[in-house]
Amino acid sequence: MPGQQRRGGGSGGNEGGRRDNRREGGRGNAPVEKTPHLERVVAINRVAKVVKGGRRFSFTALVIVGDGDGTVGVGYGKAKEVPAAIAKGVEEAKKHFFKVPRIGQSIPHPVQGEDAAGVVLLKPASAGTGVIAGGPVRAVLECAGIHDVLSKSLGSSNPINIVHATLAALKGLESPEAVAARRGLPVEDVAPAAMLASRAEVAS
């Protein structure tokens, strides 16, 4: 009987350890890895592939990743389980990082981006306005560190098209220095004084 009690106690200890592992690692076996990046899952879809024995299901995840300070990227992951699809999407997004020109927490000028049937218009906004945007656009802008902006979706309502149109708009932004260099003019001649003053305040 004492031996049986020891075996029962050992089993309880192992079960407790398994519970601790589940708490630490969520649904997986490994602990959750902390990351300095912001991650937003925009869409998760289930995909069915018809094979000889029936149908095989998998999941796709559209993920936005950014550092909240002017860097952002998008990734598309596919796997048999949702967490694995998201993880693949995150890694794919990190491979497509690009820098976004900003003035304070807004954008330097109005811009329109298009991708497939998606069309997104972005306009600068004064400090404290916030992100006036729908879900997919908001996810991209927040991950990019843009917190004062006006937006409008003019095309498709498909989240994938909207996300890629938003990224196309951000890639179309130019800093005042880039515009001045392209035109061969001083920065003061191509950028409003209020914009330069706002940027100087942020830098200080």
UniProtKB/Swiss-Prot annotation:
* Record GO cellular component, one term: small ribosomal subunit
Disulfide pattern: none
Positions with biased composition (Gly residues): 1-15
Domain of life (superkingdom): Bacteria
- Per the UniProt record, which residue ranges are transmembrane? none
Query: What keywords are annotated for this sequence in UniProt?
Result: Ribonucleoprotein, Ribosomal protein, RNA-binding, rRNA-binding
Question: Which NCBIfam families does the entry mention?
Answer: rpsE_bact
Q: Which PANTHER family match?
A: MITOCHONDRIAL RIBOSOMAL PROTEIN S5 (PTHR48277:SF1)
Q: Which protein is depicted?
A: Small ribosomal subunit protein uS5
Instruction: Give the organism, scientific name.
Output: Salinispora tropica (strain ATCC BAA-916 / DSM 44818 / JCM 13857 / NBRC 105044 / CNB-440)
Gene encoding it? rpsE
